[in-house]
Amino acid sequence: MDVSREEQFLLFVTKKEDREGMMMNLAFCIPFAGLLLCIAVLPLVKAEWWEAHQPHAIVFWSLLFVLPFAFVYGPGQAFEKVLECIVDDYLTFIILLFGLFCVSGNITLEGDLAGSPRINVGLLLIGTMLSSWIGTTGASMLMVRPIIKMNAWRKRRSHIMVFFIFLISNIGGCLTPIGDPPLLMGFMRGVPFFWSLHLFPVLLFNVVILLTIFYFLDRRAYRKDIAEGLKPDISKPGTEVHILGLHNLIFLAMIVAAVILSGTLPGMAAFQDAEGAVRGIHLFGEVTLTYPALIEVVIILVAAFLSFKTTSVEIRRKNHFTWGAIQEVAVLFVGIFITMQPALMILKANGASLGLNKPFEMFWATGCLSSFLDNTPTYLVFLTTAGALGFTEGMPTILGTVPVAMLEAISCGAVFMGANTYIGNAPNFMVKSISDENGIRMPSFFGYLLWSVTFLIPVFLLDMLVFFL
């Protein structure tokens, strides 16, 4: 049987990662755990110190992984691993966030904006539906400021942004490969583009339950705000709501197109060499900045530049636009991406030996790991594992035939459970940072985890009982 170029490249990379992961010691995961502990605890006990010394903490924990790794495997191998992480994962991650942050910051709403339970439910529903078509990050950046602005008159607002993260930043992105990077990787491995629409019943089930819970929570908070004499500041009743900076939707479309291209170009023969590897600029060892990734970065940066050049500063002023949120995310996540490498390598090397062969097992394994690790490689590990189980009926992919129920479970686990923590998906921490900047007192890392355990985990248990058993 002939093996395609993409299959050859995937097999080569998988074997290389397996070799590394099998030699990896769990002790190398300590810096990742330490960094997560800092993110969770220090804002509570040493907030001012943490605010001033975040970069130093990132450097400390990153070096605590890199230096021992270099001692054991050699400086060249350590440098290659860090460079590979930065080029393959972090670069496109932060450029995408940056581009969407810039473009969305140049769009604002004006008029009679008063957040109420019904209006908030409607806005969360709109954002959730947008997530699958412009990405969870795109929808989050587009909707976060309008929702904050509409509820600015209220005292009790943190629950609104928590459910925003649940629905818009995560669960809503399950219907297309544009929605969330794991599904884009599935598309690159042979899953049809519109296959994810099969997940609509699961999405509808989750959205109905969570929006119902949210409505009653928000109604209670709303009544308390009104009872305390708070009311929306509407100076001109009847003023029509309108959008300023609407032309920036063109630049948003450019960014979405860049993401789609990054997922489709690597599979084209023009972007592959004779061995099936994606062409690009060789940097060091086996690290290459691929041409599809470079094209994505250039398009996004051009979109961000044009957005700023064509939009009035007054719109950004009305949005209270600052660079603080993107700076915080950029600093924290470079450390997270570097220190999580040992955990990902171990997972990739041992995923097939976990003994998972049922949809509900795949759902929880993929989801729990996606809550703390990058959900894209986690998705690929379990998709590869499922494809190697030898099933003959189901969805044919280049990794093997995967039963439809198992593919649905892996997809939902990766997309939905990124909502469990602030670091589970790209937009989560960004939404938190923007909310904090706008005076909303967001839960701490553990506080947010309590919200997800209280409201999300019961819903995911219902998902398992209804869809994956």
What name fits each language-model region?
Residues 254-389:
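Transmembrane helical segments that form the transport core of multi-pass membrane transport proteins
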Residues 15-28, 49-58, 79-91, 193-202, ...:
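Interfacial loop-to-helix junctions that mark the boundaries of transmembrane helices
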Residues 28-39, 53-70, 90-99, 244-254, ...:
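Hydrophobic mid-bilayer segments of alpha-helices in multi-pass membrane transport proteins
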Residues 6, 14, 44-48, 66-89, ...:
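Transmembrane alpha-helix boundary signature
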Residues 84-96, 195-213, 282-301, 364-370, ...:
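Alpha-helical transmembrane segments
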Residues 196-310, 466:
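Core mid-bundle transmembrane helix pairs that form the ion/substrate translocation pathway
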